[in-house]
Every structure is written in structure tokens, then in C-alpha cells.
């Protein structure tokens, strides 16, 4: 496995993970050419349920407006496409929690904290461990940056599948928080916990 990195226009180091294992979920940076595919994914029923709800179904123009700045490295959100055996199977993103705006993580003071979100594109692939593999790949990628101290996420309390997925990937529940999207289970994985688990393995 290798991890490639580069500097963006904002001076933020972004990473892309590459592996030769055929059964691994890998991540590549999303490009402008992926936006139409992401638009189609974001309108699939199993994704709509947890990604904004029916009233937030996006148009292609919505997706282009929201995600193109990230693709062009004009903001601190890094978008990825998850791959399995050369085929795209999902989307993931990481972002700097500090100063993320719009009411998110307003009390955060540590610039090393990263937030994550992800989805699997195909309902037929749910419950097969791919989500856990995706999250683990994303966690490893992010902790390759020595400045990252903690990774956090915020699934809905009703999204039991996501909560189990995060727990299998090494996240711990830290209680319930109120976010702009409503109540959420606050889950974290610290660098210390990640390195401890990796040393045992």
C-alpha cells in the first residue's frame, strides 16, 4: 500500500491512497468528471434516506455548485471516490472541523481534527463489510498526515448500520450532540487509539 500526497492552492496537504490488493476498498481524489455519477448516486433511495432526505434531493446543478469547489481544491473539504476492483462503489469526504461554518463544530479549537462522511453507491453492497473497509481506508489515509490528531463523525441515532460500521472501524461513541442536521451520535477515533490498534495488529 502507498499513500500519495500533494499541496492544494490553500496550502492544505491532501492524500490519495493506492493499494495493490484486489479485495481492498481504495480511495482516489474525485474529479469534475465524477460529478454526474455522484448526482445519480445522491438520488438513490437508500442514500437519500440518510443524506438530506426526500426534500433535499439534488439536481445536477446543485451537485456541481456544492462539490465543484472541493474538486478544484478551493476549500478545505477533500472529496474521494471509493473503488473496488477498479469500479467506483462510493463517495467519501474529509474536512477540517475547525472553522467548517454553517453551525458545525463551533466549539472546536484543534486544527488537527478532521470530520468525515461517506456513502456506498449500491444498495446491494450494504451489509457486506465494504463500508467498514471504506472507513478504515479513509482513517488510514487521514492519519498519514502527522498534523491530524482526531477523526470524528456524526451519524443519525437512527442509522444503526452506520454506527456499527464506525465501531468496527475503530470509532467510539462519545454521546449525542446537536448539529445543524439535528441530533447525532458523536463518534471519534484519536491518533493514539489508531496507532495502538495498528501496533497490536
Swiss-Prot record:
Keyword Iron set for record: no
Disulphide-bonded residues: none
EC number(s) from the headed UniProt entry: 2.3.1.82
Annotated residues for binding of acetyl-CoA: 159
Binding site for substrate: 51, 154
InterPro entries: Acyl_CoA_acyltransferase, GNAT_dom, N6_acetyl_AAC6
Gene Ontology molecular function terms on file: aminoglycoside 6'-N-acetyltransferase activity
A Pfam cross-reference name: Acetyltransf_8
One example of a Gene Ontology biological process annotation: response to antibiotic
Catalytic reactions on record: kanamycin B + acetyl-CoA = N(6')-acetylkanamycin B + CoA + H(+)
Catalytic class of the enzyme: transferase
Domain N-acetyltransferase positions: 25-192
CDD domains in the cross-refs: NAT_SF
Keywords tagged on the record: Acyltransferase, Antibiotic resistance, Plasmid, Transferase, Transposable element
Subunit-level organization: Homodimer.
Matching NCBIfam families: AAC_6p_Ib, AAC_6p_set_A, N6_acetyl_AAC6
Function: Catalyzes the transfer of an acetyl group from acetyl-CoA to the 6'-amino group of aminoglycoside molecules conferring resistance to antibiotics containing the purpurosamine ring including amikacin.
Record-given protein name: Aminoglycoside N(6')-acetyltransferase type 1
Organism listed in the record: Klebsiella pneumoniae
Gene name tied to this protein: aacA4
Amino acid at each position: 500500500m502507498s499513500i500519495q500526497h500533494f499541496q492544494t492552492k490553500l496550502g492544505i496537504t491532501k492524500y490519495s491512497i493506492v493499494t495493490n490488493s484486489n479485495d481492498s476498498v481504495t480511495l482516489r481524489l474525485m474529479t469534475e468528471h465524477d460529478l454526474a455519477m455522484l448526482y445519480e448516486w445522491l438520488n438513490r433511495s437508500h442514500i437519500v434516506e440518510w443524506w438530506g432526505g426526500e426534500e433535499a434531493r439534488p439536481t445536477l446543478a446543485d451537485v456541481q455548485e456544492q462539490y465543484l469547489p472541493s474538486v478544484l481544491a478551493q476549500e478545505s473539504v477533500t472529496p474521494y471516490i471509493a473503488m473496488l476492483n477498479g469500479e467506483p462503489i462510493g463517495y467519501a469526504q474529509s474536512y477540517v472541523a475547525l472553522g467548517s461554518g454553517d453551525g458545525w463544530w463551533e466549539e472546536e479549537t484543534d486544527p488537527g481534527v478532521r470530520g468525515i462522511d461517506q456513502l456506498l453507491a449500491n444498495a446491494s453492497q450494504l451489509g457486506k463489510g465494504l463500508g467498514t473497509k471504506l472507513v478504515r481506508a479513509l482513517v488510514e489515509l487521514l492519519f498519514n498526515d502527522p498534523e491530524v490528531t482526531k477523526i470524528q463523525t456524526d451519524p443519525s441515532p437512527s442509522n444503526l448500520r452506520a454506527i456499527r460500521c464506525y465501531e468496527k472501524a475503530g470509532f467510539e461513541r462519545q454521546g449525542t450532540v446537536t448539529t445543524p442536521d439535528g441530533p447525532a451520535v458523536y463518534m471519534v477515533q484519536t491518533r493514539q487509539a489508531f496507532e495502538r490498534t495498528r501496533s497490536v495488529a
